């Protein structure tokens, strides 16, 4: 048995332990073919930077499940890996290069991509060190990266097959364009937020000089691409002008007035400018009326030659200059300020530009229908909480085609080639044989395209005979945040169903966001982010893991709070001290925990083993149901309250006594319960439980592969549970009375207990030593009828009324003098609060929160005053 430090020090406990686990190969699957497989593939973090608290939350839950199942005898695989994160990583590297005065276009594709690989290697190393500090039991022999050779092969196969099935196509459509990163974005990579803007009301003159129509737009700079003005069919106001031509202000080009169902006659003037190359609705109108598509912007958001003298200006500078010119030329009617929802790039933060572009798309409807159909079967993906299944189905029911090409250099290059002479398109797993005659598409695939294949591509697919694919796919549980259901979860489901015919995972466990103590989302702009490694350095990985799992429910946000981290450390320190006490009280030749003899149990033994049985049953059930917060509460109550506060204290009498046989029994009971507690806690707190378990008599090389606790029928004893609960209530009631009258534990007291029935009397008579050992009474009376003393404190509990005479504890005259002084103080406080609240100036000008606080203070003082007066009445009556 090892000596334990008097205080829990997480840095000492965790130092070197992870490497020992790796050296012992404890993270690899058992290889036991008779065991049920249980697999989790880690949601691959982006190699953009270090992990944040959200990643820590993800992985704490995943590793808890893996360790739990491993101890239950499952053949577990926890597969690590990382995501290349196309846009995000390229943006980071470009920003770094800019600080060095370098530009990727000047460097060239090959040199730039090498820089990104260097970045990836640096941050992958950091991420792996963070995984180690969190104690994640990952099988690194199976580590994957989304640009690995095997995963790249899977990506190409999926692209080619979907293309051959007509589910991938290339076309010119309106897409979301990021002018800063100069790439297309999918709809869910666009974040809408309210911006200040304006409706610019502009005159569009008739070509025949007969007047003008008024057009309102929020994007006047796109007018250079206008090819029509539309009105609603049958709009009586404009029936006479349909077919007439207008002159585009400052441009001079003629455009027709057309009718189209897109126009809402109730909105604005009922006249809409149509810009087919810069608006998705206008694009559809243009298709219906065969209108020209005029693109007026460059890739970087500057105006092109179509904008005339504004060419080369940034789109917003051009807007300002154009509006000024429209005003000077008499075309601007008015500017109406508004606040409207505008799309912004999730990655760069700039306003997205709807823009005509030739891109690759996935036809989503047939794939979405597979998901919706599968969710009606027994083989559906189960969501925890269940409400998120509706979120998935809602999105799949109204899904749009997915733009998958990105104008980047970092990522999976699209496996499409164009013939240099004929323009013919070739899509294949490899380049055409006469590759010198072909040019590969320069674009790469959306990061989420490869991430969508993660659960099966990491296990060997497309080789469906791969041992890992056959054994561990579908995976069992996906743990992730609810904020990426659309980005990732949904896409994994439809790709898996389409290519493997199976769901990718049985269950999806969704957690919320980690917010700061004020409930705000953590962000760089607010400066309220928390580095999980700083938390680990201060409190330890086990404390962080406990915080992340305890007190949270699936699907709910949580708040990071240093006070809660302190409480987590305190709990582990309590476990440490309890373990140290038990180990120090064992004989040198103590044997590992073994099943105790229940026939020799006293009441406290029967009670604690029944409570242990209940805890094992509940924690196992709650882990299986992913209710980790509830499981944490069960563990906390049993360990802190039942075991530490009561059973250890009760056991001290026997451990310090002369009865060697009783002492041995208590030692054996304590080591069994401690062993079971450490096993119960291990999935959540791997480091400290390993240290403590190896410090006590044990069988096996690691608690990680020890058997998870199970219930034992012989430990069930509900009668002992209720009897001990009654005794505890008696002891707590008397302790509370001592506190109320400021009587120290050493002061002698009489305890008089009036009981309601013979059963409770028997409990007290047969177990009086518990009351005596905890309360040290001068005299203990237990009876059905007791005459209440004149001066006494009373407590009522289920089944009994308790009296503690105060004559020997209280000097009545001294106590009365103290109470009178307190009465005057409280009367003054009540009077002060009343004056303040009756002051009209205070009530009229003070914030509502301040007024309510003052009202609360007054009510509190009044309550205290009533208590003091009641106490004074009791004291006077006793004289």
Curated annotation (Swiss-Prot):
<dbReference type="InterPro" id="IPR009080">
    <property type="entry name" value="tRNAsynth_Ia_anticodon-bd"/>
</dbReference>
<dbReference type="InterPro" id="IPR037118">
    <property type="entry name" value="Val-tRNA_synth_C_sf"/>
</dbReference>
<dbReference type="InterPro" id="IPR002303">
    <property type="entry name" value="Valyl-tRNA_ligase"/>
</dbReference>
<keyword id="KW-0648">Protein biosynthesis</keyword>
<dbReference type="InterPro" id="IPR014729">
    <property type="entry name" value="Rossmann-like_a/b/a_fold"/>
</dbReference>
<keyword id="KW-0030">Aminoacyl-tRNA synthetase</keyword>
<keyword id="KW-0547">Nucleotide-binding</keyword>
<feature type="short sequence motif" description="'HIGH' region">
    <location>
        <begin position="45"/>
        <end position="55"/>
    </location>
</feature>
<dbReference type="Pfam" id="PF10458">
    <property type="entry name" value="Val_tRNA-synt_C"/>
</dbReference>
<dbReference type="InterPro" id="IPR033705">
    <property type="entry name" value="Anticodon_Ia_Val"/>
</dbReference>
<protein>
    <recommendedName>
        <fullName>Valine--tRNA ligase</fullName>
        <ecNumber>6.1.1.9</ecNumber>
    </recommendedName>
</protein>
<dbReference type="InterPro" id="IPR001412">
    <property type="entry name" value="aa-tRNA-synth_I_CS"/>
</dbReference>
<comment type="function">
    <text>Catalyzes the attachment of valine to tRNA(Val). As ValRS can inadvertently accommodate and process structurally similar amino acids such as threonine, to avoid such errors, it has a 'posttransfer' editing activity that hydrolyzes mischarged Thr-tRNA(Val) in a tRNA-dependent manner.</text>
</comment>
<dbReference type="InterPro" id="IPR009008">
    <property type="entry name" value="Val/Leu/Ile-tRNA-synth_edit"/>
</dbReference>
<dbReference type="Pfam" id="PF08264">
    <property type="entry name" value="Anticodon_1"/>
</dbReference>
<keyword id="KW-0175">Coiled coil</keyword>
<feature type="binding site">
    <location>
        <position position="524"/>
    </location>
    <ligand>
        <name>ATP</name>
    </ligand>
</feature>
<keyword id="KW-0963">Cytoplasm</keyword>
<comment type="similarity">
    <text>Belongs to the class-I aminoacyl-tRNA synthetase family. ValS type 1 subfamily.</text>
</comment>
<dbReference type="GO" id="GO:0005829">
    <property type="term" value="C:cytosol"/>
</dbReference>
<dbReference type="InterPro" id="IPR002300">
    <property type="entry name" value="aa-tRNA-synth_Ia"/>
</dbReference>
<feature type="short sequence motif" description="'KMSKS' region">
    <location>
        <begin position="521"/>
        <end position="525"/>
    </location>
</feature>
<dbReference type="GO" id="GO:0004832">
    <property type="term" value="F:valine-tRNA ligase activity"/>
</dbReference>
<dbReference type="Pfam" id="PF00133">
    <property type="entry name" value="tRNA-synt_1"/>
</dbReference>
<dbReference type="InterPro" id="IPR019499">
    <property type="entry name" value="Val-tRNA_synth_tRNA-bd"/>
</dbReference>
<keyword id="KW-0436">Ligase</keyword>
<dbReference type="InterPro" id="IPR013155">
    <property type="entry name" value="M/V/L/I-tRNA-synth_anticd-bd"/>
</dbReference>
<feature type="coiled-coil region">
    <location>
        <begin position="806"/>
        <end position="879"/>
    </location>
</feature>
<keyword id="KW-0067">ATP-binding</keyword>
<dbReference type="GO" id="GO:0002161">
    <property type="term" value="F:aminoacyl-tRNA deacylase activity"/>
</dbReference>
<dbReference type="GO" id="GO:0006438">
    <property type="term" value="P:valyl-tRNA aminoacylation"/>
</dbReference>
<comment type="subunit">
    <text>Monomer.</text>
</comment>
<dbReference type="InterPro" id="IPR010978">
    <property type="entry name" value="tRNA-bd_arm"/>
</dbReference>
<dbReference type="GO" id="GO:0005524">
    <property type="term" value="F:ATP binding"/>
</dbReference>
